[in-house]
């Protein structure tokens, strides 16, 4: 074991407040020797933004330890685009910046890709323009399939829905549980799947992503999925722990003491 990929909401944060054991987990990871990254489907904040949010909750984590679905989406677009690098982006500044930094020009006409994330400025014109461009041949890409985030916040899947209904075309979702997101995170850490653990609270995103990518998986019961939910799934996590407090001894056992 050389590395840990860890979800944020439901593992270390809940409604922007630290969960039990969060500070101890963060401090332990920062001391080493494990490489680690906090992986989130939330596309509307940069790593620096997330680091500030964590700091407000008393968790000191440098920005370089965060990887988002916006970053993975930009990486996916780079690999797919070839010489076609023109995109219409529906999203906040973090996604727009990631796509721009990937070498794309941003436009609302004659584009190669329509990229949808999350934005508080979502409106009729955005829906109409996105649908029009997709119907004219633009490829439909979305950051993540989640319909709702913490506190019932509308997430990417909710923004995608009307565009999908109008066009009759489903997007390619980059974020968890897509294996592309996991491979991007592994590359970010510089490790192989058999050297890394996936820690998360959601069977439908975190755990299935880890299972499909060949990682050891740990379900933390302080978030979305509970032990009683497991009967609904054909797959299982390798480990189940109550919270981050219970995760620490497990990590110490597997690494010979952190």
What is the predicted role of each segment?
Residues 2-8, 13-32, 43-67, 74-258:
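Asp-based, Mg2+/Mn2+-dependent phosphohydrolase catalytic module
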Residues 40:
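Conserved phosphate-coupling serine/threonine residues in phosphotransfer and NTP-handling enzymes
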């Amino acid at each position: 074991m050389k590395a840990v990929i860890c979800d944020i909401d439901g593992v270390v944060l809940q409604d922007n407040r630290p969960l039990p054991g969060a500070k101890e987990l963060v401090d332990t990871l920062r001391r080493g020797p494990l490489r680690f990254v906090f992986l989130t489907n939330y596309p509307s904040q940069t790593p620096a933004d997330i680091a500030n949010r964590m700091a407000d909750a008393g968790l000191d984590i440098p920005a370089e330890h965060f990887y988002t679905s916006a970053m993975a989406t930009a990486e996916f677009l780079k690999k797919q685009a070839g010489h076609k690098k023109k995109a219409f982006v529906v999203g906040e500044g973090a996604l727009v910046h990631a796509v721009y930094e990937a070498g794309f020009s941003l436009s609302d006409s004659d584009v190669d890709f329509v990229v949808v994330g999350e934005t508080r400025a979502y409106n009729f014109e955005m829906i109409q323009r996105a649908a029009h461009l997709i119907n004219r041949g633009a490829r439909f890409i979305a950051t993540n399939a989640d319909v709702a985030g913490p506190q019932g916040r509308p997430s990417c899947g909710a923004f995608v829905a009307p565009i999908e209904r109008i066009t009759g075309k489903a997007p390619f979702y980059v974020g968890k549980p897509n294996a592309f997101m996991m491979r991007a995170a592994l590359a970010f850490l510089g490790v192989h799947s058999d050297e890394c653990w996936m820690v998360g609270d959601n069977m439908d995103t975190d755990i299935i992503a880890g299972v499909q990518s060949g990682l050891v998986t740990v379900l933390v019961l302080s978030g979305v999925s509970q032990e009683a939910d497991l009967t609904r799934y054909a797959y299982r996590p390798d480990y189940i722990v109550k919270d981050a407090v219970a995760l620490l001894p497990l990590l110490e056992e597997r690494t010979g003491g952190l």
